[in-house]
């Protein structure tokens, strides 16, 4: 089970809702993924305009927890304003804090992310900050009281996978709150690897929505995350420099 801010979830896959080729494909991908948490950019949603279609109208919202994000914010103040807008819509009190510090790499601004997280915690939000793989920053965010840490595997939408698994493993090892690998996952292999490291969950968007067959990829990611988690719980064998025979040596005939 995945526990975030007093809420409990069965699925360890969080799914983004942007850039799908159609509402129909999006809805089917969400269904087969069996994700329970769906994230979306508040700035791209007409949450107060009933005449404008959006993906929320396509879903049975009783089955999902919505995770608005502050994509588009470049300062803490902007992120807080976006979060307040999402909360005012009545959708959810959870917020993914996303404050971008570089428009080219889309890497997060560490200082503004810390500030935004602190401000939103004071306002009673369930705060999930998107951050880099900086181990010290992750610790400082946890010390603030965030409800989960979301380090990026690599730049958003890059599909480069886990560029620094060592740092991610350090973050996972030290954290007392859930660690959700977010950004840069490109394939089921990446998702499984993140879970094998001990991550509590993986958040995906482009890897599914940008695939040739988003629905099939959503299913593949679901299975990869489940198998990666099982592998982590089972415990892999230690790495060795030399081979070790798997067959017993006792009872072998002498020639």
From Swiss-Prot:
Gene Ontology terms, MF aspect: thiazole synthase activity
Function comment: Catalyzes the rearrangement of 1-deoxy-D-xylulose 5-phosphate (DXP) to produce the thiazole phosphate moiety of thiamine. Sulfur is provided by the thiocarboxylate moiety of the carrier protein ThiS. In vitro, sulfur can be provided by H(2)S.
Family as reported in the entry's similarity comment: Belongs to the ThiG family.
Annotated protein name in UniProt: Thiazole synthase
Residue numbers annotated as active site: 96 (schiff-base intermediate with dxp)
Regions that span the bilayer: none
Keywords: Cytoplasm, Schiff base, Thiamine biosynthesis, Transferase
Pfam families, per database record: ThiG (PF05690)
UniProt EC number: 2.8.1.10
GO biological process: thiamine diphosphate biosynthetic process
Reactions listed under catalytic activity: [ThiS sulfur-carrier protein]-C-terminal-Gly-aminoethanethioate + 2-iminoacetate + 1-deoxy-D-xylulose 5-phosphate = [ThiS sulfur-carrier protein]-C-terminal Gly-Gly + 2-[(2R,5Z)-2-carboxy-4-methylthiazol-5(2H)-ylidene]ethyl phosphate + 2 H2O + H(+)
Subunit structure, interactors included: Homotetramer. Forms heterodimers with either ThiH or ThiS.
Gene (UniProt): thiG
UniProt superkingdom: Bacteria
């Amino acid at each position: 089970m995945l526990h975030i801010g007093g809420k409990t979830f069965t699925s360890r896959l969080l799914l983004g809702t942007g850039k799908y080729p159609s509402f129909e494909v999006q809805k089917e991908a969400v269904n087969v993924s069996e994700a329970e948490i769906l994230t979306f950019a508040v700035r791209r949603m007409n949450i107060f305009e009933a005449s404008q279609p959006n993906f929320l109208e396509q879903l049975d919202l009783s089955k999902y927890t919505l995770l608005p994000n502050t994509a588009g914010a470049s300062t803490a103040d902007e992120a807080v304003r976006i979060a307040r807008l999402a909360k005012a819509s009545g959708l959810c009190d959870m917020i993914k804090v996303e404050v971008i510090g570089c428009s080219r790499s889309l890497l997060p601004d560490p200082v503004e992310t810390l500030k935004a997280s602190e401000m939103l915690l004071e306002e009673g939000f369930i705060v999930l900050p998107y951050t880099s793989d900086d181990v010290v920053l992750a610790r400082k965010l946890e010390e603030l009281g965030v409800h989960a840490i979301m380090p990026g595997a690599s730049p958003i939408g890059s599909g480069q996978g886990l560029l620094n698994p060592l740092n991610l493993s350090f973050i996972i090892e030290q954290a007392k709150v859930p660690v959700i690998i977010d950004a840069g996952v490109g394939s089921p292999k990446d998702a499984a690897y993140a879970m094998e490291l001990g991550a509590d969950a993986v958040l995906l968007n482009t890897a599914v929505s940008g695939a040739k067959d988003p629905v099939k990829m959503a299913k593949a990611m679901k299975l990869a995350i489940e198998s990666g988690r099982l592998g982590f719980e089972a415990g892999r064998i230690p790495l060795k420099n030399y081979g070790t025979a798997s067959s017993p040596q006792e009872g072998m005939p002498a020639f």
